[in-house]
Amino acid sequence: MSAAKEGKEKKPVATVVKIVEVESVSPSKDKRPTRMKLLNNLSASSPQTYPPKTDKRSGIKGSRIKILNEDVLVAPKVEKRRSTKPTSPGATATSTVKILNEKRIVPAEETALETTKIKISPPKRNKMDHYVLQPVKVENNKSASQATRGATGEDEDTIAFILGDDDEVVPASTSRSNGQEILVTEEEEEEEEDDLDEEGDSPGGSNKNSGHKAIKEIVEHVCGKCYKTFRRLMSLKKHLEFCRYDSGYHLRKAECWKNLEKIEKDGDVLEKKDICFCCCESYDTFHLGHINCPDCPKSFKTQTSYERHIFITHSEFSDYPCSICNANLRSEALLKLHEEQHKSRGKPYACKICGKDFTRSYHLKRHQKYSSCSANENDTMSCKVCDRVFYRLDNLRSHLKHHLGTQVVKKPEYMCHVCKNCFYSLSTLNIHIRTHTGEKPFDCDLCDKKLSALVALKKHRRYHTGEKPYSCTVCNQAFAVKEVLNRHMKRHTGERPHKCEECGKSFIQATQLRTHSKTHIRPFACDMCEEKFKTEKQLERHVKEHSRQKRPYFSCTECKRHFRNTAQLKQHMDAGDHSEKSGEKPQRAKRSSTKVLERTDCAICDKNFDSSETLRKHIRSVHECDPDDIFGIQPPSAKRAKINKIPKVDEEEEEEMVPVALNASSGSLISSQTDDNGVVVREFLVDEGDGTAQTITLENETYTILPLDGEIAAEQITDEGVKVEGQKTPPKKSPVVKKEKRKSLGASLAAAIADNIEVPPVEEDFEGEVLTEEDLKLKENIAKLIDMLADPPILKKYGWPNAPEEMVLCKVIENCGYDLNKGAENYAELDYGSRMREYCKLLFTVVIHNDSIKSLLNNFPIDDVIEYVLGDEDQDEDGADNGEGN
């Protein structure tokens, strides 16, 4: 009996597999699942068992399987009870076929069939590697497939699986025609044999008592980290290289698939409450980046993005670090792929108009449609209320809130725990907190500067690259930052929104108002008295005065003189000098505290700044000039102080002169008395021909100047404090000195003067004339003009500064090609002041070709033009002092 059973087991058995039913579920828009039910139906002629592994490999290896139409083998009754549902869009009805072994087919039938060899492409098999197969039990129903299987007496167990994502996989049974032949490779047969062996070893592999064969179970390879299943071991190994084992992404995804119906019901309820059914958080926090990384200052909007950042950036594997970012990869292949993504991820989409780069084409299209780079005017959106034009829809919506009165309000939940300031969003709060912590994670790649925000880094890099994308529509001046352009536009419109509540003065910037408010606040108060000060240094100096007054002193009983210590008092008592003069308390010499008030407005572009240091930076960077050339920091008193010139007199008449000096420290006049008991206040040398008396005003008192006897040819002594009546003061000019015009004048003069000139020796033809006060002032201005316009090496060739101003000025004019001998007779008849004025006119018209100076000469006197070119610095500083006091 045993030998007979073994003989039966060794016989090859025909395996019949029926594809009873193929259902196609209508695909949805997002996900198109295809559900197929497979059934293994074994032959019911006699109970059979699977042949051994070795026999099957030797008998079936390399065999071909033919698909025959079931109409030949199945009775018509079964055909009537079958389902009439279409299998696919390409097939009209479901056909049931039988798959028989090639060895059991009659040769005559084989020749009658048309066969076609089809080679299955490997990519289609690989597509199913990443889908999870889940067994689903189907309830008993009275279908045609059940009736067929009931006749054979087999149990029913259906395995259904869903093909996710957007890949559409069409079942092979619906796409093949009847009688087609499939070529099965050796690798596939070995995998099928392994599956059959595992099925035979399983407890449910055979059930001899019941007489029914159990359904074959598909054995999958499961990832032990994320619990994802695979049909092949090679697919599992590839998956392990990319598996994000430290995140719960796969677990949550598998849980969602198991409880899909429950999640959909819960999602409908949560959607009404504005809560996401996936993360159970409010939709208000989706765009806020509320998930912060504990290892770096980055924040993320979703949990998935955060987990991906943790896996890539803060991974524990350090064998293959990325040279571009901080990511650490597991293998060299992954590192190469990661670095290629860096290159391809750059910003491949660029705007052809402004050159701005984008990572996605959608961002570029949005930029081209809703920005100033739009080619069509129809892309702009205007407000229906005020007709204001916008390029982006979100900007228009925020603008409409101003009309509706529903402006965005700072939320208290975004409050800084340090300074208690509230912000609109969590991202702005995170940037603000870095100002307290001092954290600056963004480094500039062009300098050593670090910034606290990425937006600030982008603005900072524009100063290195010279990019100025924002230009003024009025004056065409370009700016690197849009905020600076908005502030600049207020100069054209005259808008000054920041107004001081104390004095009513308005400013363009809030920083200017804060600086100005310090003049009214005086926050530093003295504890010993009621005085208040603007700065802490002023308070410290004031406190020192209090401490100095509290110092102990020792006084003399006879003269009431005070001393700091007993040694000085004893020395005073031993000397015995108790006179009234010695008893007086010595007056402390007052310190000459000269306060230098520097200007804060640019002399070239009329811009105002908060401090002089900011103005200096502006002059260096924008105008490329030396700030000291634009405005000086020398004290006004030092500029007003001038050295009195000693007049040249003959030795015979030297005794007749009465010297008079002015004591600047005491402020009083040192006078001398004449023979007729008259007080000589000041002597002035006047021309002999002028016999009339002149009146002068000296320190608010009027004095009479009498002519001296004798002929004295010398220069007249003048002082700034003396003002001669009857003379016209020059008209006031604007305090803003145009530095650019000075530079152009100096360049023109330097180009006009030749370097290789032979200068004659200094002559004394210009001496011996009596100069008036106006002539002396003109002479001094011409000397300044020569120093300012000409270079020192060139002036040194002309004998400057030892040579007279008139001679140097004439040599400069003659060297430029103008012959002064033509009008020598006319110039000889003029006095000193008239000659120098004519020479200056020739200097500005012949030597220096400047249209603006020529226009000034047509409208103003030459003296005013010279002062305009030089710049009245004293008047500028006085105006700055008055502006600061206001």
Curated annotation (Swiss-Prot):
Its main location: nucleus. The keyword Zinc applies. Residues 184-201 have a biased composition (Acidic residues). Residues 24-62, 167-211, 571-594 are annotated as: Disordered. InterPro entries: Znf_C2H2_sf (IPR036236), Znf_C2H2_type (IPR013087). Disulfide bonds: none annotated. One of its GO terms (molecular function) is DNA-binding transcription factor activity, RNA polymerase II-specific. The keyword Transport does not apply. A zinc finger (C2H2-type) spans 221-243, 291-314, 320-342, 349-367, 381-403, 414-436, 442-464, 470-492, 498-520, 524-546, 554-578, 600-623. Residues 571-587 have a biased composition (Basic and acidic residues). PROSITE patterns: ZINC_FINGER_C2H2_1, ZINC_FINGER_C2H2_2. Keywords: DNA-binding, Metal-binding, Nucleus, Repeat, Transcription, Transcription regulation, Zinc, Zinc-finger. GO terms for cellular component: nucleus. It is found in: Nucleus. Component of the gypsy chromatin insulator complex which is required for the function of the gypsy chromatin insulator and other endogenous chromatin insulators. Chromatin insulators are regulatory elements which establish independent domains of transcriptional activity within eukaryotic genomes. Insulators have two defining properties; they can block the communication between an enhancer and a promoter when placed between them and can also buffer transgenes from position effect variegation (PEV). This is Protein suppressor of hairy wing. It comes from Drosophila ananassae. The lineage of its organism: Eukaryota, Metazoa, Ecdysozoa, Arthropoda, Hexapoda.
